[in-house]
Amino acid sequence: MKIGVVYALPSRQSWLSIDVPEGTTVKEAIQKSGILNQFPEIDLETQKVGIFGKAAALDAVVEEGARIEIYRPITVDPKTVKRRAAPEAPAAGGTES
């Protein structure tokens, strides 16, 4: 079966296509892909993984054409990012000129 394993940093992305036998787990596919050698900072014990954007367990069996994604940890609070991106509201009771 042909599958893909992907990982992305802000400055570098990797998409590896590999052939695996039926019954291969997510963890086995990641290990076989060699991506752990390219990105030694990946820690499968702490980082989440998914298939096509949906969380997956390391022992889940992959299917033909699957795209396994290794997710980086969140380093910024999403609420902080949203707050920074939102336009400032006028002060309560204030008037605009």
UniProtKB/Swiss-Prot annotation:
Protein name per Swiss-Prot or TrEMBL: Protein RnfH
Entry's family note: Belongs to the UPF0125 (RnfH) family.
Pfam (any one): Ub-RnfH
Spans through the membrane: none
Organism: Paramagnetospirillum magneticum (strain ATCC 700264 / AMB-1) (Magnetospirillum magneticum)
Top-rank lineage group of the source organism: Bacteria
